Swiss-Prot record:
GO molecular-function term, one example from the UniProt record: nucleotide binding
Recorded name of the encoding gene: dcd
Family, similarity comment: Belongs to the dCTP deaminase family.
UniProtKB keywords: Hydrolase, Nucleotide metabolism, Nucleotide-binding
Pfam (any one): DCD
Listed NCBIfam families: dCTP_deam
InterPro entries associated with the record: dCTP_deaminase, dUTPase-like_sf, dUTPase_trimeric
Organism of provenance: Xanthomonas axonopodis pv. citri (strain 306)
Statement: the UniProt record of this protein carries the keyword Hydrolase: yes
UniProt name for this protein: dCTP deaminase
BP GO annotations: dUMP biosynthetic process; dUTP biosynthetic process; nucleobase-containing small molecule interconversion
């Protein structure tokens, strides 16, 4: 299994719609020329953006967090260019980009150092072979202060690993519960 380069990522995005919308370069400034957290194709990965759609966790109902019986009322929905995450809390978002993962490829997501150095951790499970959809992102604010996330700017890097053998059973074959997700998706069992 080897990590794939910018050339492979560009080819797969342009010829097979692996990433939509796709940015072949690295964007570091907005339309007004202001610096932003970069996004787009890097040497061996793709830096994704989060959309303006957020779900911020609040425990106003004093519920127990249970992945089998998750209470959607534990979140406040926000649509904004900026999301403020309360201290020691978390928020969910989704990528701007829609992914279609090839059958012989596994994608691993890592947070961007710009956020990590501020105590904001991004968590995403691997994108499995033949999974497709918008990626649901989880941002943990590990600090005792409110933390800010910017929509339409880079938040995480996707690394693409291509196997030397095609898997016997893909995520699509298994009927994965998050196949084709398009919004911020809460836990499913």
């Amino acid at each position: 299994m080897s990590i794939k380069s910018d050339r492979w990522i560009k080819r797969m995005a342009e010829q097979h719609a692996m990433i939509e919308p796709f940015e072949p370069g690295q964007i570091k400034h907005d339309a007004a020329g202001q610096r932003i957290v970069s996004f787009g194709t890097s040497s061996y990965g793709y830096d994704v953006r989060c959309s303006r759609e957020f779900k911020v966790f609040t425990n106003i109902n004093s519920t127990i967090v249970d992945p089998k019986h998750f209470d959607p009322g534990s979140f406040v929905d926000i649509e904004s260019d900026v999301c403020i995450i309360p201290p020691n809390s978390f928020a969910l978002a989704r990528t701007v980009e829609y992914f279609r993962i090839p059958r012989d490829t596994l994608v691993v997501c890592l947070g961007k150092s710009t956020y990590a150095r501020c105590g904001i951790i991004v968590n995403v499970t691997p994108l499995e072979p033949e999974w497709e959809g918008h990626v649901t992102l989880e941002f943990s604010n590990t600090t005792p202060l409110p933390a800010r996330i910017y929509a339409n700017e880079g938040v995480a890097q996707m690394l693409f690993f291509q196997s030397d053998e095609v898997c016997e059973t893909s995520y699509k074959d298994r009927g994965g519960k998050y196949q084709g997700q398009t919004g911020v998706t809460l836990p499913r069992t």
